[in-house]
Regions:
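Bacterial N-terminal signal peptides that target proteins for export
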Residues: 2-14
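Sec/Tat signal peptide C-region and signal peptidase I cleavage site
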Residues: 24-29
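Bacterial N-terminal signal peptides
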Residues: 13-23
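Preference for long, well-ordered alpha-helical segments
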Residues: 145-148
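Central antiparallel beta-sheet cores of small beta-barrel/beta-sandwich binding domains
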Residues: 31-139, 150-169
Length: 169
């Protein structure tokens, strides 16, 4: 049986996954492959909201590798707040307007799936795992992304997050 701490950390993996999904750029509206502009290093910060109503600052760094005619993506992302830190790996594919993929976090033996659709510079995405489901709203303008995450699970330790990412130079 999972402890509350382990469950909270697994849910945080969903928040990290949201950061990754947030970098899917504005290329959809222009008919370009969504991963086209992702290759490279990204970083950002924001806040997470805990179930007790408190907020913590969070910082993240991500590395993106775009593969196979820019329709596949490999990701490694590291994030840390006062009470969380983790190293997430993920893979995604873009086909016929849909983004699908998988993620894993080996230190906590956690894994799950992602799915979503793009509408211009706005994305509505769902991340799932055995211990959580999270709704994600993503907006991209140029080299900046804003991410709003809301857990769909009432018992989660992390209720949501608001994060901004920017591509490194």
């Amino acid at each position: 049986m999972r402890s509350v701490s382990a469950t909270g950390k697994t849910r945080m993996m969903g928040l990290v996954l949201a950061l990754w999904l947030s970098a899917y750029g504005g290329g959809h509206a222009q008919g370009l492959a969504p991963f086209q502009k992702l290759a490279g290093q990204w970083s950002g910060s924001g806040t997470i909201e805990l179930s007790n109503g408190t907020q913590e600052p969070i910082r993240c760094r991500a590395a993106y590798d775009v593969l196979e005619q820019q329709s596949n993506l490999q990701l490694n992302i590291r994030c840390a707040s006062e009470s969380y830190s983790f190293d997430l790996r993920a893979s995604a594919t873009y086909a016929a307007g849909a983004i699908t993929g998988t993620w894993s976090e080996a230190t906590r033996n956690a894994a799950g799936t992602i799915s979503g659709k793009a509408d211009g510079d706005r994305f509505q995405v769902v991340a799932t795992g055995p211990a959580f489901t999270a709704s994600l709203t993503l907006v991209t303008r140029g080299n900046r992304q804003s991410v709003t995450i809301q857990s769909q699970d009432e018992k989660t330790r992390v209720k949501g997050a608001s994060i901004a990412l920017q591509r490194g130079s």
